[in-house]
Amino acid sequence: KSRQGLLLQRCDWLPIARKLDLIEPAARHFLRGVIERVREKHVNGEDLRLYLPVAASSLFDPAFAPWLAAEFGAHAVPSHVVALEFDAAEARAELPRLRGALEPVQRVGVRLALNVGAADAADLGKLLAIDAFGVVKFARAGDADAKPETAWEPWSKAIAEARSLGKIVVASGVAGMADIGVLLRFGVHYAQGDALSGWLAEWDFDFAEAEL
């Protein structure tokens, strides 16, 4: 009821929403706010493209895709400027019924991205084989002090596989320009990270993209 707001990152609001059994309402409220943000930027002539973290369980709500399409239409925001980002571990847990659930959301026109963390290195093949995931984000392994080779070498085979399947490959959490040489060698398409640009870093979306 106040005009003051507290920005909750995905790691904060998802556990709260699960505990309250409010995953779908929380995700929708979150998405609506960001779509409005995109509209504001487009009105001002700025080109803002976003990755939006979404719980995989949202896909199994039959009303989710129609609602998403209606939100884009209501705010006059083209759906292709948004990529819905799914955590690889969550997606793997829902793998048996995931493929069919992705189709209605695909028809809305949004890109679908897979966010792969350090704990998701095993058994990525089945997820990468899903055509709907056109974008794959690989997070830097280790902390910012880890050497570039140490931080990115664990992803070398997975990046090569994703590229062979025609995916757009994104490296997230880039710690500095020293990482870029390794990423170029691996054939990564885009790099993201606060080290490249601090713009809106507090949103934890890595808005800044530097094409390699």
Description of each model-found segment:
Residues 17, 30-38, 64, 68, ...:
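Structural preference for long, well-ordered alpha-helical segments in enzyme cores
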Residues 22-97, 173:
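Catalytic core of bacterial c-di-GMP phosphodiesterases, primarily the EAL and HD-GYP domains
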